Amino acid sequence: MTWKTLDDMALDGKIVLTRVDINVPVADGVVTDTTRIERIVPTVTDILAKGGLPVLLAHFGRPKGKVVPEMSLRVVLPALEEALGRPVEFIAHPDRAALEALPKCTVVLAENTRFAPGEEKNDPEMAAALAALGDIYCNDAFSAAHRAHASTEGIARLLPSCAGRLMQAELEALQRALGTPTRPVVAVVGGAKVSTKLALLGNLVEKVDDLVIGGGMANTFLAAQGIDVGASLAEHEMADTAREIMEKAARAGCSIHLPKDIVVARKFEAGAPSQTLPVSECPRDAMILDAGPETVAALKEVFAQARTLIWNGPLGAFEIPPFDMATNAAARAAADATKAGTLITVAGGGDTVAALNKAGVADDFTYISTAGGAFLEWMEGKTLPGVAALEAA
């Protein structure tokens, strides 16, 4: 992968159209999680330091090509100004002359790109209209890179283009994790359904040395091996697919790790009475809601031998104690190895980040991706249009 960064661009006196992802949660008109806003600060700061005028392009929600007032980006303005420590000009529909008349140190936020029907269609006319506003295009929205939209893909083919600091960090971390990794490589994949992560599992077994499967997905694999999983969430219709993945892994020399012991309960609620049992002894009326301590001990051994770890999805029902034990313990083991300098750890996906934050170890991982769908599609081995456009620029 080769792409230009801000270091390769002459920005002084230039209008820099900067695609960012500030699609943040909002309640009662207030941003409730500023993580994505905070992570674009280095890019905006660097553009200003190099004499450029950043014009921020972003989407918010899914207005589907129509103006929806409650999805205006104006709502993020206070949080954006606080993160940057400077005022931001909100110009819903900027034109070139207006931008050229602004003082050099100005930051501009344009209106929701998805208000325009041409955005999600990657309409060439919209891409050209956007490109006419600036001199340079900077994509700092890896989390939107799996979408071939006018502001992520079309525009990059019309202007000198580069990756912003967050995009650069994401791409370098992911390349380090799966492109040219330090081996052995272990992937942890959790979540509810095999059907949503088929492409991911199929790609990973050919690229990693160890694959840890957790959450509801593990139940499907256990059932495919003839193990009774009781009343647990499981996709029994995916049994043949699960067996095919296991056979593919065996051919590729990838070891699959499933729970050895399980935590079961008859109610899915906080504080519900639970038991820890061997994986083969799940009661018919009970649900598997977490992996047990024997499984965690085995995972710690896998992590101790590994040099690179990629994590997507929790190992159990981490939202509800006590079914967060395996996720928390495994996360802490990975974090400890990272701090000791023996393991490179990269994690992504909404539930994954929430689980690592809950375990209190997110800051100890080598890299936490802000992307959801883009992170998954990259792990699936797919080409991301927003990245491909930068490579072609």
From Swiss-Prot:
The gene is pgk. Pfam families: PGK. Pathway: Carbohydrate degradation; glycolysis; pyruvate from D-glyceraldehyde 3-phosphate: step 2/5. ATP binds at residues 197, 319, 349-352. Monomer. Belongs to the phosphoglycerate kinase family. Its EC number is 2.7.2.3. This is Phosphoglycerate kinase. It catalyses: (2R)-3-phosphoglycerate + ATP = (2R)-3-phospho-glyceroyl phosphate + ADP. Keywords: ATP-binding, Cytoplasm, Glycolysis, Kinase, Nucleotide-binding, Transferase.
